[in-house]
Amino acid sequence: MSTNICSFKDRCVSILCCKFCKQVLSSRGMKAVLLADTEIDLFSTDIPPTNAVDFTGRCYFTKICKCKLKDIACLKCGNIVGYHVIVPCSSCLLSCNNGHFWMFHSQAVYDINRLDSTGVNVLLWGNLPEIEESTDEDVLNISAEECIR
């Protein structure tokens, strides 16, 4: 995806939790807007969430663009929480974007700002280590109280 013109390094990293059951879905979330309709707020992540969501239903296309999408549901409660861009369309690839293909509906998840290693400052995308989602045990095993705050 085209990210050379746009910079997302100053965006806050969020922990994304399911609104229905409070399950942690991702420790690498970012607030975003839908490329095809910038009035729609959502969250996104760059790494496939592990042991948190799975595909549900059939692939579909939107009326606004030609991206091929598939819904994702929370593994704990079964509610649809977002979608995965299976095949992005050329207009979305050429747009200013963050390179993320995993999207979460703002009506289905809530975010918690993730702190840096000092535990004081909000972690920014420019300082985020490039590691696998599944190896980030400290963040994925956060307490229920942390997710509820």
Swiss-Prot record:
Induction: Up-regulated in peripheral blood mononuclear cells following Epstein-Barr virus (EBV) infection or following transfection with EBV LMP1 protein. Keywords: Cytoplasm, Mitochondrion. Pfam families: YPEH2ZP. Its main location: cytoplasm. InterPro entries: YPEH2ZP. May be up-regulated in malignant colon cancers, compared to normal colon and colon adenomas. Expression is also elevated in other common cancer types, including breast, lung, uterus, and ovary. Changing W125R: Loss of UNG-binding. It is found in: Cytoplasm; Mitochondrion. The keyword Mitochondrion applies. Belongs to the FAM72 family. Interacts with UNG. May play a role in the regulation of cellular reactive oxygen species metabolism. May participate in cell growth regulation. Highly homologous to GCUD2 but localized to a distinct locus. This is Protein FAM72A. It comes from Homo sapiens. The gene is FAM72A.
